[in-house]
């Protein structure tokens, strides 16, 4: 205690605002340090944890070990994407543009219906309920128009789903496909860091269900297709 009083004086000009624990048993260390700091009248000192942290380690310390940290410093696992170091995106041909400007749907055949791509030029939409919460995403043909306030029939992408078809009436709809590069040129104004943060925050609060954010067994985001898309896929498969 005498060491803490000397190390962290109450002089406002020299007051330490936080203490970082970076090694050893982090949760246990936070409890011991919090108890010691409180005992010498320094509850204002915040505790920060770091050292190879990720969302699972943080959840374990908070939920099961009852750590006394005020904030967590995540670096390595935030920028390296340790669980998914490689983006496995693959471009597949879905349509060929004809001289008259129309598109002919194309499809890569597969032995598995679940792996067969969805043919045709398409436009994804997001549908919202009366509270402004996103209900699901909908894959439509590019020339289809999805309107707010009008019933929309959707077909489940999962062929084994109990309810294959459902109809809802969204109060708001939004196109999700926004061109960023056209003819090799940037087509949008790049957002600032603050705008990016605000966009992500809105995605997590209004565009995503809480059940989709669970660390364990998260709920899958609903993605359906219009009957026109389902029919095109069925005819070509």
Residue ranges and their predicted role:
Residues 24-27, 33-45, 53-237:
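Gly/Ser/Thr/Ala-enriched C-terminal appendages of enzymes
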């Amino acid at each position: 205690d005498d060491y803490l009083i000397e190390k962290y004086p109450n002089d406002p000009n020299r007051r330490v605002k936080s203490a970082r624990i970076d090694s050893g048993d982090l949760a246990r260390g936070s409890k011991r340090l919090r108890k010691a700091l409180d005992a010498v009248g320094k509850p204002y000192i915040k505790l920060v944890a770091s050292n190879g942290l990720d969302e699972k380690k943080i959840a374990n310390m908070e939920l099961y070990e009852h750590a006394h940290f005020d904030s967590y410093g995540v670096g390595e696992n935030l920028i390296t994407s340790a669980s998914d170091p490689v983006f496995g995106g693959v471009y597949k041909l879905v349509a060929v543009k004809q001289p008259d400007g129309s598109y002919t749907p194309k499809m890569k055949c597969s032995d598995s219906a679940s792996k067969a791509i969805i043919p045709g030029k398409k436009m994804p939409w997001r549908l919202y309920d009366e509270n402004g919460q996103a209900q699901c995403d909908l894959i439509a043909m590019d020339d289809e128009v999805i309107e707010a306030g009008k019933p929309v029939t959707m077909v489940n992408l999962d062929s084994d789903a109990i309810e294959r078809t459902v109809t809802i009436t969204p109060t708001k709809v939004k196109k999700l496909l926004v061109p960023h590069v056209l003819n090799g040129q940037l087509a949008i104004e790049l957002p600032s860091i603050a705008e990016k943060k605000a966009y992500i925050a809105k995605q997590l609060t209004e565009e995503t269900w809480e059940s989709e954010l669970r660390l364990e067994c998260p709920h899958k985001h609903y993605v359906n297709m219009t009957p026109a898309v389902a029919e095109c896929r069925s005819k070509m498969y």
